[in-house]
Amino acid sequence: MVLVGLQGSGKSTWTAAALAGTHAVVSKDHWPNARRREVRQRRVVADLLAEGRSVVVDNTNPAPEDRAALIALARGAGVPVRAVWFDTPPAVCARRNAARQGRARVPPAGLYGTLARLVPPSTDEGFARVDVVRAAPA
């Protein structure tokens, strides 16, 4: 499963509530100081899939080119891959992000940089399905 959405869109919160104990959660946020986090993430995902584990990739994954390698890994493992699109208004994401503490807070330029690249996922990319999670009214 590949999560797609801005920082502050609710990806990690949703994962904790909806997938507690059922999926291995892989996030580049787990290795904030690591070099080549993208390569490390792909290796961890591949290893987990090879073990037969259900995996959720909890990152922004804003554009098709960011998601392509993850889709290829799942297909290579013979696993259908699903996207979950967090359709949260940017203003809500910015407000949630501003309330975060420490490393969890992303600089506004980072959030808006992600927004500039954000393309909703599509089955045309190779996802078996795309589910949508909308933000609760604020």
Question: What is the predicted role of each segment?
Answer:
Residues 77-96:
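Conserved phosphate-donor/acceptor-positioning beta-strand/loop module used by diverse small-molecule
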Residues 70:
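Aromatic/hydrophobic pocket-lining residues that form π-stacking "cages" and hydrophobic walls in ligand
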Residues 1-4, 9, 91-138:
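Conserved GTP-binding G-domain of TRAFAC-class P-loop NTPases and closely related GTPase folds
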